[in-house]
Every structure is written in C-alpha cells, then in structure tokens.
Amino acid sequence: MKMKRFTIVWDFDGTILPLEPCDSEQSLLMHVMHHAGKPFGRLKKAYTKAIIYADRHERLRRTFKASYIRLLKGTPSGVIDEVCRSLAEKISTADRRVYQQLKTDGYQMMVLSCGTADLSERVLKFAGLQNCFSLIEGNRFEFDHNRITGMQLRLPDPEDKLHMMRAFNLSPDRTMVIGDGYTDLPLLNWSAMPVLVDRSGKKKKTFSAHNFYFISSIPELTNIIKKALTSNVSREKVPKVI
C-alpha cells in the first residue's frame, strides 16, 4: 500500500541556502555597509562587523536582530532584490532538482526561519523555487515608500517555530524537519524524522547527543525519504546517514 506523503519543514539559512560564509541577513548587512547611499563611518563599520561576527558564532542573537533592524532602516527594497539575486546563485542545480522533484512527488513543504522571510522568499523566487513551498514564514520587514522602516518579529526565537507547528496541528510522526543548527533544535527534537545538514562535516560531533540523521548535501535526503516511506517512520528504523 502506498504511504501518505509527509510534510517537510525546512530551515532556510544554512539549510536551503549554503552559508559560505554568511547567511542572508549577514549578507544584506555587509552589502549595505559597503554600498549604502550614505557611507558607514569607521565606528559604524566596526560595530557592524562585530555583530556579524557574533551572529556567525551564534552569540548575542537578540542584540544582532535589534542592531540589524536599526542599521537597515532606510534601505530601498531594490537593494534587497540585488542581494537576493546574488544569493540565489548559491543554491546548486542539484539542490534545485531535489526541491522540484519533492514538489512533483506531492510533498507539502514549508520554510520556517528565525531569519528574515523577505530574504527567504526573494532568494527562492530568483532561484525558481518559491512555488515549491506552501508557506515561507519568518520575521518580516516593514516598509514605507519602499524603504525599510522596521521589522515584524513573527518567529524571533527557535521555540516559536515549534509553537507554529503545533498551531498547524501537524504530527511529529508525519513531519520531517530539516535544519542546520541551534535555532532548529526545538523542531528537530520534536520531529520523528529530524535531519541535520552538515556540509562542513563538523556538526556531527557537536550534535552527537541528539538522535538526528546527518546529511552533507541536499541530494542525500532522497535516501532518507525512501527509507522513511518503507518503514514505520521511527528513528530506530531509519538509519542515520553519515
């Protein structure tokens, strides 16, 4: 008997979008710092670089978000398009085929991110992948006259993604969660099919205490899904992929 397709919930930065080395928010900040209509002064540049460094090392998350919003105020929407068009090129052809095939195969997929949904949406649009996802959720810029004025914090904390899943009445046994780090832990620990993307090969040791399945590339996900469809979708029956 053919099994019902399960829901696949994706993180964005570091999962769909390879970091190499900056995520989408950091990339936007870096671009604005170097190309702003009013150039950043020496102290402002030093501060921007410091908060980007802290965010890359998963520190001062709330401080980063507040500074991020303040530094981006007045940025035109067109600048976001420029950055996202460039970021979309990081998503490989092989990865794009996986998302498109999963969509064709009937999987409901959504993106939940503690980052900026405007960036996720536009990157996926420029990559030709936006229609693969039924929902793209995260924190959203507020605009006035096509310029950033603030941000609506819809998913500021990792636990907020889990609250949203529960509000959708999704079952952990029928939901695969794919992430790459600490902001994904509540969802990964909730799901019966947690997959951690480890492109560098360094995260397996960090998250060894968790019963996750590890993949080093998006195409490897295909094998996990095939096994899940022929098992009872339990962590014991779907072997970890190294």
Language-model features and meaning:
Residues 21-22, 28-108:
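A metal-dependent, Asp-based hydrolase signature
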